């Protein structure tokens, strides 16, 4: 996955349509097709690493292809994929995805709207059971009986997708930067 070492604004749209796979120790795999992303880089005031390196954001400075997981509002976790060469803090927030199946732990109110089960960064982490313990994990296929998170697919077939680029949402600084991408018309795209 050498292509993850590119700038986050190039990686973010390339992730659309790819499948994020979450494997549990019992062998269960849940696949989520990525439908919405946002890019964050060192010179961006909305980036967690904008001012300096801290204990919280240090994963963003690490090698590309690792997970940067953080908590928002004290309640929800967000999944980011670190990009750019080591030492340059940047990441792509996975804002929303379409699950291939609804795991048993998905709340009953989401069972009627399966496309909405991971339609937002917090919902995505809940659906894939990703939390702070996954911070720093490397994206790599796991052996049977082991936990893992990895990507499947290739950005090369994206010509078939209707990709929309717009400004990021849910932030106050850098909100004018058009670094949000999503698959147009997809029902799993976040609502705000």
UniProtKB/Swiss-Prot annotation:
Q: What is its EC number?
A: 3.2.2.-
A GO MF term: alkylbase DNA N-glycosylase activity
Locate the transmembrane regions by residue number: none
Assigned keywords, A-Z:
DNA damage, DNA repair, Hydrolase
The record's annotation in Gene3D superfamilies points to: Methylpurine-DNA glycosylase (MPG)
> What InterPro entries does the annotation carry?
Formyl_transferase-like_C_sf (IPR011034), MPG (IPR003180), MPG_sf (IPR036995)
Q: What is the similarity comment for this entry?
A: Belongs to the DNA glycosylase MPG family.
Q: Which PANTHER family match?
A: DNA-3-METHYLADENINE GLYCOSYLASE (PTHR10429:SF0)
This one is known as Putative 3-methyladenine DNA glycosylase
Lineage of the species this protein comes from: Bacteria, Bacillati, Cyanobacteriota, Cyanophyceae, Synechococcales
């Amino acid at each position: 996955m050498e292509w993850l070492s590119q700038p986050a604004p190039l990686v973010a749209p390339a992730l659309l349509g790819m499948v994020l796979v979450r494997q549990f120790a019992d062998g269960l795999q849940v696949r989520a097709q990525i439908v919405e992303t946002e890019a964050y880089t060192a010179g961006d005031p909305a980036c967690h690493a904008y001012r300096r390196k801290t204990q919280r954001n240090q994963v963003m400075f690490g090698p590309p292809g690792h997970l940067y997981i953080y908590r928002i509002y004290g309640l929800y976790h967000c999944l980011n994929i670190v990009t750019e060469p080591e030492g340059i803090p940047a990441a792509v927030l996975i804002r929303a995805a379409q699950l291939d199946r609804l795991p048993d732990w998905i709340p009953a109110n989401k069972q009627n709207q399966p496309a909405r089960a991971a339609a937002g960064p917090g919902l995505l982490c809940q659906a894939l059971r990703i939390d702070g313990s996954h911070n720093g994990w490397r994206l790599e296929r796991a052996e049977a009986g082991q936990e893992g998170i990895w990507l499947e697919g290739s950005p090369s077939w994206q010509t078939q997708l209707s990709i929309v680029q717009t400004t990021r949402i849910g932030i106050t600084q850098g909100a004018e930067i058009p670094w949000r991408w999503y698959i147009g018309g997809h029902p799993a795209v976040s609502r705000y």
